[in-house]
């Protein structure tokens, strides 16, 4: 229901699309504009979503926002700030300062160096971009190239796009472990 979002494309494998449609019907998601097929990697899936966006009328100067189902607690503030920063930047992403001391080990057994925690940030989703610039950086990339991308902003940064960091939120955590899922379920039961 965010006012800065006009259309929603969901990237999902065909086997999940019926299930997702049942939830879209319950939530009356009027901005849903269709599915794009899942790719062989996260970034390949994103490219499929970008192609689908073009098929429904996305143009180069449109703003896009990329989010994943693993972070269901994204706030309206984060979405707004990601979108608002596109007036000055090619992209924006929420980040949190790293709290732990980070060590580098080249062999996995002993410390090679200590990284400066004051310069390290943990990236979150969603990430927003200027549609045309973000689509263009994928031209000529192979499936192997796409499989090596670990984050939407990684590829943008490596291709010279100017990416802004906005304050993230501890509540916008990624559900990747059983403990994360249990935490999310407890939070849903409390509300």
Feature annotation, model-predicted:
Residues 1-61, 142-144:
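Conserved N-terminal catalytic core of the sugar/cofactor nucleotidyltransferase
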